[in-house]
Amino acid sequence: MNSSSNIIYKSFKNSKIFLNKQCIINNGLKLNKKYFTTTSTKENNNNNNNKNPKFIENNLFQKGLLTIGSAFVAFINPGRGDMVATLGEMTGGCAIKSMKQKMMLDPIGRQLLKEKPRIKESTYPLNIHLLPSTTFGGAYYRWMKEHGYSPDERTEVTLIQDEDDAYVMQRYREVHDFWHVLAGVRPDFQGEVAIKWFEFLQTGLPMNAIGSIIGPLRCSWNERNELINHMIPWAIKSSKSCVYLMNVKYEDHWEDDLNEFRAKLNFIPYKYLSDINQNKTTTINM
């Protein structure tokens, strides 16, 4: 990173306005709302009937500030999950509507929208830690523990007003780790870029398109080589072959054999080149 970029980054790092969406909403440049409202009073009254209870009111200026600020910080530091989440909420509009429409056309999707189940540690089955690693639930549990993740850490959706739209985004965040397990893709930077390609083709979310295009530029040469020549083609093929994954109630499949569950979904897992080469070497030495 050059000196000018360092100066910009440090200024953003020290700025609560750009690094904290709550601060932008509550304190960010208190402009007269009548010049920046995005919906009419009539529309607001209609939306209140199906309003996300966690929604934080924001105006047009604040939306722009959040979008630009979160995009900049997420690019500089992809590890900032809160900024990545904010960017997703700010840019997801049409894609989220399309995702919801696909769910409404499917019986399981409609059930999910109606019941709005959450993926939390408190909703895990009591025996999940006892499930074999060959099962979907057992593989998921061990994958989460191995990488130190918890579904409880997923950011709550607060910038999408419609309750169903907000749930679609929340559900997408919470099933992200399921897709990693089904894909057999590691959660390192290279793996996340590959999953972003897969997710963009499944969901159409602009945030994933941005990550899938810019991501390879941040990879090493070797990582980029496997990513471009193998992982991205896999993501394209697998995303097209499998069912629409937002219409899957994963909670009903904890005890399913992982490979059988993949087959049921027509999900093609990824095989790393290192694993393929290792298997070839083992076979030759036998």
From Swiss-Prot:
> What's any one GO cellular component for it?
extrinsic component of mitochondrial inner membrane
Q: Where does Zn(2+) bind?
A: H176, D177, H180, E192
Q: Which UniProt keywords apply?
A: Lyase, Membrane, Metal-binding, Mitochondrion, Mitochondrion inner membrane, Ubiquinone biosynthesis, Zinc
Biological process (GO) annotations held by this record are: ubiquinone biosynthetic process
The enzyme's main class, written as a single word, is: lyase
Reactions mediated catalytically: a 4-hydroxy-3-methoxy-5-(all-trans-polyprenyl)benzoate + H(+) = a 2-methoxy-6-(all-trans-polyprenyl)phenol + CO2
Compartments it resides in = Mitochondrion inner membrane
Job description of the protein: Lyase that catalyzes the C1-decarboxylation of 4-hydroxy-3-methoxy-5-(all-trans-polyprenyl)benzoic acid into 2-methoxy-6-(all-trans-polyprenyl)phenol during ubiquinone biosynthesis.
Remarks, miscellaneous: This protein may be expected to contain an N-terminal transit peptide but none has been predicted.
Q: What HAMAP family would the database entry show? A: Coq4
Family assignment from sequence similarity: Belongs to the COQ4 family.
Q: State what protein this is by name.
A: Ubiquinone biosynthesis protein COQ4 homolog, mitochondrial
Q: Which species is this UniProt entry from?
A: Dictyostelium discoideum (Social amoeba)
